[in-house]
Amino acid sequence: NGPMIIIAGAGSGKTRVLTYRIAHLMNQGVDSFNILSLTFTNKAAREMKERIASVVGTAEAKNLWMGTFHSVFARILRSEADNLGFPSNFTIYDTQDSVRLLSSIIKEMNLEKDKYKPKQVLGRISQFKNSLITVKAYFNNSDLIEADKMANRPKMGEIYHHYVNRCFKAGAMDFDDLLLRTNELLTRFPEVLAKYQDRFRYIL
């Protein structure tokens, strides 16, 4: 009962260890409702859930929250979206949706396409979001602003601002938002954080 990290190479049995750790917890009386398991791929999540069900039974495993970081965070956000001003049925933009929106924004801002290529701009925005850098945080970070000026893209902050606003107005999030918005949710709303802390006693 405490933090633990397992470091091992591919095919060495990490998934098996996690699977049997979860099954052991459940056999010791821990309710599957109180267990959260995060994986990097949907395939791994499916395989783990099937293995656990084969050990403890399908009925026992049904309340287990298991999935990729993105799928689990999307599930949390759909339950709590109203706190952030989003509908519970918000749209999740894929890369093509995001590139299309950025192309429109870049055109509306009359920016040179050679300097602001939509896919590259999206990559930069993705870097911001995965570093938990919001639009406000960007404009408060002189190093980021200077870096974009040096890279000949001084309007990056404005594009980011418009992109976030347009997504919000459309009731949409992109894949990176699933991480950024969940962080925002749990940071801004302590009662929501407490709710999930109380529920998930074991996170693997």
Language model regions located:
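ATP-hydrolysis module of ASCE/P-loop NTPase motor domains
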Residues: 60-63, 82-177
